[in-house]
């Protein structure tokens, strides 16, 4: 699949790190470092603009290493880039740790995953079919 992209960053285009990678790393495109205090959030620009085909979205997801090792994650995970959006891709990062975290220019801050999606058409009804689960939710199937 080919996707049109404008790269106004000072970095290479996102790429798949391994043959089986689902996501491509997004890099911070910032003039000076950003310090995120504990529980603070900010939008980090990437310098990237994309044009997706209709029927596709780009999902902005956390990098597992950044979340596990530093407590920094994507706040609205997954963030969605719609096919008709033409603005710069930004990443909403939040620091969930107890320590300050410094974001440097070029740092890998999130993953971008291209995904196909469907448009739903609602069919309004008076009742839904029964299942063994019924209305059980929020842990109703057990915790272990």
Curated annotation (Swiss-Prot):
Pathway membership, UniProt: Pyrimidine metabolism; dUMP biosynthesis; dUMP from dCTP (dUTP route): step 2/2
Sorted UniProt keywords: Hydrolase, Magnesium, Metal-binding, Nucleotide metabolism
Keyword hit for Calcium: no
Enzyme class: hydrolase
UniProt protein name: Deoxyuridine 5'-triphosphate nucleotidohydrolase
InterPro entries registered for this protein in UniProt: dUTPase, dUTPase-like, dUTPase-like_sf, dUTPase_trimeric
Signal peptide: none
Keyword Coiled coil: no
Binding site for substrate: 63-65, 76, 80-82
Gene Ontology terms for molecular function: dUTP diphosphatase activity; magnesium ion binding
Reactions catalysed: dUTP + H2O = dUMP + diphosphate + H(+)
Annotated function: This enzyme is involved in nucleotide metabolism: it produces dUMP, the immediate precursor of thymidine nucleotides and it decreases the intracellular concentration of dUTP so that uracil cannot be incorporated into DNA.
Cofactor: Mg(2+)
Biological processes annotated in GO: dUMP biosynthetic process; dUTP catabolic process
Family in the record: Belongs to the dUTPase family.
